[in-house]
Amino acid sequence: MTKRNFGKDYKTPRELVTLLENRGLIINDRQKAQLYLESIGYYRLSAYMHPLLKTPKILHLYKEGATFNKVMMLYRFDKKLRLLLFNEIEKIEIAVREAVMNMTAERTGDIYWLTNSALFRDQSIFVNSMVMLSKEYERSTEDFIEHFKRTYTEPFPPAWILGELLPMGSVNMYYRNLKDKGLKKQIAKRFCLHAPVFESWLSVLTLTRNACCHHARVWNKVNKIIPNDMRGMTRPWITIPADKRRIYYNMCIIKYFLDIISPNNDMLDKMHNLFSKFPEIDLAALGFPVGWENEPLWQ
């Protein structure tokens, strides 16, 4: 692909409102639209304008009946969806961290295993992990970390304390790099998964978690990572083919984990509540297949 100059000048929110109107977007309240462009930004909102464009989208002309109100509806729905997903992934992140930290300490007999290079396959990855972990430890102002630094002589706390500084992606990185395949299998089995699937699903959840943390669009995004399939599934799962790059499949993964760590979870109720508040949302854009509610996972 040949590169070219950016070639676009800055436009004020007022000028952007006029530009959108000239392209066919219906704006009933120019002042309110200008306020949203000032507080949210045109670039962020453009992701929610994109589905309303005519084909070919490169012409930047809007479909008949496309409104700025619809843009804001999509924006608000995505925001609510991110909050829902992040709150549910948090529970999984805590449970997975506990399993990896404690099960590894128990099996290896090393409560400081996070800093033991002998337990890891790839030493370059381990070194990078230690650099990251050391920085997190040194700059942490958490009470439990400050207490350990004041009280004990060891350079680092035990894994179940130090691990509290690690986000899901880092926990998965440590897990993937473990030498002991039997240990990895044992940890994955805690969640009724094979080790490669466990790794893959954690990677997908990490992407979704980070998207939620950074307020990125999730509702109709196509993920770059395609999660592995689990063969011989022993727990309720989905049977209707679904696009594994869409957020629906991610939500299935979230529900699967929740059903293990919190069997009485109310994720489905939260989803119904969200969808009822945004009846205009086309669930197919999120990857939901027809009949999804009848799947064993969602019963």
Identify the meaning behind each predicted range.
Residues 1-207, 219-299:
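Extended intrinsically disordered or low-complexity regions, especially N/C-terminal cytosolic tails and loops
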Residues 215:
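Acidic/aromatic/glycine-rich contiguous surface patches that form carbohydrate-binding/processing clefts
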